[in-house]
Structures are given as C-alpha cells and as structure tokens.
Design a protein with these regions (language model features):
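Active-site metal-binding motif and surrounding structural segment of the metallo-beta-lactamase
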Residues: 60-61, 72-116, 272-274
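Accessory terminal helices/loops
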Residues: 151-153, 157-174, 269-273, 284-390
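Metallo-beta-lactamase
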Residues: 27, 34, 61-63, 69-71, 122-300
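Conserved beta-strand hairpin/beta-sheet module of binuclear metal-dependent hydrolase folds
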Residues: 32-83, 216-231
Length: 478
C-alpha cells in the first residue's frame, strides 16, 4: 500500500508540474516562471510578444498584475494561479497601463479591487471606441498571415512564428466580436500608492508618458521585484519585440515629466532592494544599467529642451543638436532606440510640454477634415508664408511626410499628393520630399509626373538606389 501511495504521489507531482510549468493553451505553448516562492509569471507562445501576467501570493490574498487581450486566456491563467498557490482568494488586480493587451481580461477579476493610475480608465474607453476599426483590421490581416503561412516552410522558426501569430490574432478577433466587457479600475492614484499585504508591500508609482498616459511601475521590495509594464526593455529575447520595441514619448499625450523622473530616481536610489526588473511582455528583459541609462537619457533631454526654449532655439536645430547617434552613441541601435523617429518624438513631446506649440501637420489634418482639402491647403499655405502660425505651431518635414503616407496608405491620393507638394515647397533641398511625391503620383497612375520627380531625386543624388529602381519600373511599364 505504501508503495502504491508513493507511485500516486509521484504521478500527482509530475501531473501538477506539467500543468503548472508546461502544456498548451489553445495550441500555444504555456510558460510559467517561478520568480520566488510567492511570485509566478505566466505567458503563452514561443515567438509572439504576448503579455506576461504575474501573480503574488500574499497574506491577504492573491494579487494579479495585468491581464491579456483575450479574456478566455485569463480564465485559464486564473485557474493555474489558483492551483499553484493552493487557493482561490483573489483580492487585487493591478493594471500597469490602459492598453487592451493588459486590460481586456479585467472582467475575469471583477470580484477583486482593480488598481491603476487615474488616467487608465480614460484610455480604456478610447480603446473601446476603436473596437470596430480593430475588428476590421484583424479581418484584413489574418488572411495575409494565412497566405504567408502557406508559403513558409513547415517546421521552420518562421513557420512557427506565423502560426502562433495567427492563433493569437484569431483569439483576439473572436473576443472582440463576442463583445468584451470593459471592467474599469475601482481604485486609482495620481502619484504613488502603497498596499500592505502582510508578508509583502506593493508600491505603485506613476510613470506615465513613455508608452501610455497611465503607465505605472509596481515595486515589491520584500521580493526584490520591480514590474515595469511596457515602458522599457534593454534586451530583446526574440526578433519581434512588439510593445517593447520603442522607448518613446507620444506627442500629444499629457504627462507630468518632473513627477515621472522623481519617481524613477527614487527607485534608482533603492537599487539594493531590486533583484529583477520585469517588463510587461515575456520577450524582453531589463537590467539595472539599462534602467539607469534610460533615466539619464530622459533627464538630459529635459534639461536640453528647457535650455533651448530659454534661448529661443528652433525645434529643428534642437533635433540636430540632440541627434541620437552623436549625442547618445551608447544607446543608438539598442533595444528601444532602433528608430530615429522614436528619439525625435521624445524631444518633440518635451518641447510641446515646455512651449505649448502644436504640430503644424496635425493642425493641417484637422483643417482638411473640417474645411475640405482645397480650402485647407490654401489656408495653410497662406499662414505658412505670412508666419501667422509660426509661434503656435512647429513645422517638421518628417511629420508632413508621415501625414502624406497616412493618406497614401488610405488610398486618398489627392490628399497625399497635396501634402507631399506642400513638403516640396517647404523643404526644396530635401531629396526625400521629391521621392515621396513621385511615389504618390505613381500610385495615382500619373507616371509622367512620377518619373519627373524620381529624376529630380537622381539629379540631387546620382547614386540613389530607390530612384534608379523606380525609374526602371516606370520605363518598363511604358
């Protein structure tokens, strides 16, 4: 009998270890990492940048940090967490920020108090209002992925990556179509908050503006863990970093930068208490050096922008002075800093906070929406020439280029051509503006005009590979 009991216990342990530390959910590999005796981290997938949900086993009950984009996945996660910690007493849920891949599963914890920053609910409502557009995007994108899968070699990493992506997108689409019940935070804070959980303390810090308006850090000193949400990572574990790809402010998002830096610095000062930095997605890591380097970077930008505003410098010259590769060479090309526009957005965000100036390209887009294309462009051209908006708005070539491509991708060719033509007028020495205008004319079927602008690019830069390529394509179609 004792021998049979031993076999049963061993079998049970093996079964539980498979259930908790492996297996699959909806065809996706399940991963559960033990961060300490009282903390686990769960995610699905070997390739997709899925949200990593963490759970803390406290004296007062189980605390969960973040949910996923698909509530049915959170149902499974909750069962696993309860099994692991030997109880079903879930007491709190904490959202590190507003985005749907961290809040859509909140309804699964509607029996808990839900903690978040005071701006979180507002952001969740914006996401909810955008659901139909997202559904439409999924319906267009999934068939494209399925086509890619049919062309990929079975068994390769690329094949597995695409397959996982399809599973996740279909799960999310099904959840959206079935109607996700938004469950908003019930307890919010502005600066920081502390939760006494008996065997551990949970400290919440405002960190808004580097990923969303409602970013927070979650610090558990007794466990030596700092959960950083989607704000940053300095190591990518896959070639699809997803939400962790950019370390950048979003122009237009209101934030309290001094408060953010103050909270950030206070955590740097407690480095001896932090053993591990935990990003909001499984496929990124964060080190102490990366954590500090990004703080120093943001502090430098704040000081330099403040100085430039005081000296009446133009934003364009400031962007040149603070060029990523020359001013921050150790960060350039590292995770979060692989795209120049992200760095530029950090500068622009601080600039707009200090000056109150708005983006001229955004102002033009609003005018087009209200007045129609012709009236808006004529009014904008007049205001640019007489300088009436020079103090209220800032003008940047790349922002107008982005606006033009926004229209181009929407197949609004007259709007795209009009924007690119304005960019040519404002920045006649830039070869890129002619290249963009040539592309717009080509997509609109105006080959002669497209050819003339690509020839203009080639005249400015005889070795321009793209211009040569496009001229060749146009000539072949004649």
């Amino acid at each position: 009998m004792k021998f049979k009991n031993k076999i049963f216990l061993v079998s049970l342990c093996l079964l539980l270890s498979v259930y908790v530390f492996g297996g699959t959910i909806n065809g996706l590999p399940l991963h559960i990492k033990k961060l300490s005796d009282n903390v686990i981290r769960l995610w699905v997938g070997d390739y997709v940048s899925s949200t990593a949900v963490s759970a803390l086993n406290t004296d007062r009950g189980i605390v969960v940090i973040d949910t996923t984009q698909c509530p049915t996945l959170d149902v499974q996660f909750r069962k696993i967490i309860a099994k692991k910690f030997g109880g079903k007493n879930f007491i709190y849920l904490i959202n590190t920020h507003e985005h749907s891949d961290h809040t859509n599963g909140n309804s699964i914890y509607s029996d808990c108090e839900i903690f978040a920053h005071e701006k979180c609910a507002e952001g969740m409502k914006r996401t909810q209002a955008d659901q139909q557009r997202v559904i439409g995007w999924y319906k267009e994108y999934i068939p494209k992925l399925e086509k890619q899968l049919s062309e990929a070699k079975e068994g390769t990493d690329n094949y597995k990556k695409i397959k996982e992506d399809i599973i996740v997108r279909k799960m999310n689409l099904k959840a959206l179509e079935s109607g996700i019940k938004q469950t908003f935070p019930t307890k919010t804070f502005k600066d920081k908050m502390k939760l006494d959980m008996g065997n551990m303390t949970i400290e919440l810090f405002y960190m808004g503006g580097l990923h969303s308006a409602s970013d927070i850090f979650v610090f558990v000193p007794e466990e030596g863990l700092l959960f950083t949400g989607d704000v940053m990572a300095d190591v990518w574990l896959t070639d699809t970093p997803g939400c962790l790809q950019s370390f950048g402010g979003r122009p237009g998002i209101k934030r309290d930068l001094p408060l953010m830096l103050k909270n950030w610095k206070s955590l740097i000062n407690r480095k001896e208490k932090i053993k591990d930095y935990i990003p909001g997605h499984w496929n990124g890591d964060l080190t102490y050096n990366g954590f500090v380097a990004r703080y120093n970077y943001m502090e430098t930008l704040q000081k330099e922008v403040k100085k430039a505003v005081k000296e009446n410098k133009e934003l364009k010259s400031l962007l040149t002075d603070l060029h990523l590769k020359t001013r921050f060479p150790k960060l350039a090309g590292t995770p979060g800093f692989t795209r120049d526009f992200v760095h530029n957005n950090n500068i622009i965000s601080i600039w707009t906070e200090k000056t109150g100036a708005k983006s001229a390209s955004n102002a033009l887009a609003e005018m087009i929406e209200k007045k129609g294309l012709k009236k808006a462009v004529n009014k904008f051209r007049d205001e640019y020439k007489n300088g009436s908006k020079s103090k209220k708005c800032y003008y940047l070539e790349h922002e107008f280029n982005s606006l033009g491509y926004r229209y181009l991708n929407q197949k609004k060719y007259p709007e795209a051509i009009a924007i690119f033509k304005l960019n040519v007028e404002m920045y006649p020495k830039s070869k890129n503006v002619y290249d963009s205008l040539g592309e717009a004319y080509l997509k609109d079927g105006q080959k002669k005009l497209a050819l003339s602008y690509y020839n203009k690019v080639l005249k400015m830069d005889p070795n321009n590979a793209n211009a040569k390529k496009m001229i060749g394509i146009i000539n072949q179609k004649k």
